[in-house]
């Protein structure tokens, strides 16, 4: 990893965190309005769907098919989550599945030696953010994402990542300015809909890599340490049913039981019902039963 790449990742983690602290101070002093919360919510939903449905379920695992325009729109929205360019993100994630919780996994929390609290914390930190300064972007896209490399439109989305990041900050500023009629409204729109949104979405996503490989429940026979973490399911758009996902990586749905809330899966179903998605991968109850262990383990 180049020094410039490492510094960019460092800025991408620290700047949203500092902005979050500023937002907490403003919130404490009630300097926040419903407009700011609305801009934050809309931005979180759009870019969260971009990561969950676009980068992950569609582009990484090809769990459904859709029109080119929707593919590129989801890839652009995922880029505006500021978790890295699409080719690097997909390549890193495919490598994660190839070596899940073994040597070669970019962000496993289980590679630190020993089971003492210090080792667990070291692994947790590495999986959550530490890997961004060591492993992120190192997976060879020609090896791990040749399908996307062959897609000219996806290469354009990948190259325009820095500009999409800028757009993801300009839009909430513009929305705040237009809705409030003041530069201060633009600033608070940028703060909440830009930096706080990025901070929240980052750490929900990072928690899938860290928490969901350490604590939670298991239902299926699976050769890694993935876990389902129910309390993260809504904020993560269903990604926290992570053990289900590792058991059936190509499934369009991570929530496999009726009560396993999966907003990302609901979005895909909505696309399907409007004729905008097809070849949606579903895991039958019979296939699930064949892979189930005798009882769930924690």
Regions flagged by a language model, labelled:
Residues 1-206, 251-298:
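Non-catalytic, topology-defining segments of multipass membrane proteins
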Residues 5, 52, 60, 210-212, ...:
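Generic hydrophobic/packing signal
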Residues 77, 145-153, 215-241, 246-248:
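Active-site-proximal inter-transmembrane loops
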Residues 183, 187, 191-231, 235-236:
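Alpha-helical transmembrane anchor segments
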């Amino acid at each position: 990893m180049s020094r410039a790449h490492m510094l960019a990742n460092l800025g991408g983690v620290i700047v949203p965190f500092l902005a979050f602290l500023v937002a907490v101070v403003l919130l404490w002093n009630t300097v926040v309005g419903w407009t700011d919360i609305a801009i934050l919510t809309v931005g979180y939903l759009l870019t969260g769907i971009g990561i969950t449905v676009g980068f992950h379920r569609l582009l990484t695992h090809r769990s459904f098919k859709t029109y080119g325009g929707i593919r590129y729109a989801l890839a652009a929205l995922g880029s505006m989550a500021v978790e890295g360019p699409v080719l690097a993100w997909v390549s890193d994630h495919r490598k994660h599945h190839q070596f899940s919780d073994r040597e070669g996994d970019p962000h496993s929390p289980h590679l630190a030696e020993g089971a003492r609290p210090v080792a667990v914390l070291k692994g947790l930190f590495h999986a959550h953010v530490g890997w961004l300064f060591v492993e992120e972007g190192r997976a060879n896209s020609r090896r791990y994402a040749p399908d996307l490399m062959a897609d000219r439109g996806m290469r354009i989305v990948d190259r325009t990542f820095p500009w999409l990041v800028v757009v993801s900050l300009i839009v909430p500023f513009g929305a705040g300015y237009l809705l409030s009629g003041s530069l201060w409204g633009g600033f608070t729109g940028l703060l909440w809909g830009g930096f706080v949104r990025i901070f929240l979405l980052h750490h929900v996503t990072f928690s899938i890599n860290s928490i969901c490989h350490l604590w939670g429940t298991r239902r299926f026979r699976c050769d890694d340490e993935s876990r389902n973490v129910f309390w993260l399911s809504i904020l993560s758009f269903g990604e926290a049913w992570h053990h289900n996902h590792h058991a059936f990586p190509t499934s369009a749905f991570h929530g496999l039981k009726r009560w396993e809330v999966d907003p990302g899966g609901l979005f895909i179903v909505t696309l399907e019902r409007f004729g905008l998605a097809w070849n949606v991968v579903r895991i039958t109850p019979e296939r699930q039963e064949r892979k189930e262990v005798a009882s769930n383990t924690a």
